[in-house]
Amino acid sequence: MNTQIIQLEDTKLEVNNLNFHYGDFHALKNINMRIAKHKVTAFIGPSGCGKSTLLRSFNRIFELYPNQYATGEIKLDGENLLTSPMDISLIRAKVGMVFQKPTPFPMSIYDNVAFGIRLFEKLSKADLNDRVEWALSKAALWNEVKDKLNQSGDSLSGGQQQRLCIARGIAIKPEVLLLDEPCSALDPISTAKIEELISELKHDYTVVMVTHNMQQAARCSDYTAFMYLGELIEFDETAKIFDKPRLQRTEDYIKGRMG
């Protein structure tokens, strides 16, 4: 049941026999899947099903916490990220992440976006300015903040802060962008802007998102994975998952007959 290999034109991430443990708790069980390049893939399922755990495995963010470990393979363009000798900061630069709650750094709007660029690249001031403008434009925020770049990121609204975090994430030009319930703390208007942005971002990045909002998954994603109790139950094109799922358990969840 946890092997969901669908035919893709171009695979960006390949997950093979992935297991994850929180101490003695077996949170992910033999996950196998392929994530399509330049598409949006959504993970859905009830709370505690493992969707955020799976997402956070992709850039090894779990290593920041004790007694958590993953086994198996998560391959980015063929390289297993779980065993790669690459510096972990470079892995997280390639596989960026935006969290559920907007987390602007305690610094100016400009410095929030420039922060990662300064860590990984040596750019002239002019090139840095261009990159900051580019990232804010990509995040559909430039026109709203271009005259107040020196103001604190905390001065922005919640929706603007989340777009600032997305700008910060894409400023270092990752290959994959992970979004962990990016709209759950936002109002409907801000949510609509983020959803529109997600649809644009896939032209440049491979986007993987976790959402509790099934309508959001249906609107934004190209592929959807349904998870339950640490298992990958069904994974297919989003239209197929929502219109004609293969499994009864998937249909029950989609139609609200299970929590």
Swiss-Prot record:
Catalysed reactions, as listed in the record: phosphate(out) + ATP + H2O = ADP + 2 phosphate(in) + H(+)
GO molecular function, one term: ATP binding
Bilayer topology annotation: Peripheral membrane protein
Any one of the GO CC terms: plasma membrane
Pfam families xrefs: ABC_tran
Subcellular location: Cell inner membrane
InterPro entries per the UniProt record, alphabetical: AAA+_ATPase, ABC_transporter-like_ATP-bd, ABC_transporter-like_CS, P-loop_NTPase, PstB-like
The EC number(s) this enzyme carries: 7.3.2.1
EC class (word): translocase
Ranges of residues in domain ABC transporter: 13-254
Biological process, per Gene Ontology: phosphate ion transmembrane transport
Superkingdom of the organism of origin: Bacteria
UniProt keyword annotations, A-Z: ATP-binding, Cell inner membrane, Cell membrane, Membrane, Nucleotide-binding, Phosphate transport, Translocase, Transport
Binding-site residues, ATP: 45-52
Assembly with partners or alone: The complex is composed of two ATP-binding proteins (PstB), two transmembrane proteins (PstC and PstA) and a solute-binding protein (PstS).
Family: Belongs to the ABC transporter superfamily. Phosphate importer (TC 3.A.1.7) family.
Function description: Part of the ABC transporter complex PstSACB involved in phosphate import. Responsible for energy coupling to the transport system.
Protein name: Phosphate import ATP-binding protein PstB
UniProt source species: Pasteurella multocida (strain Pm70)
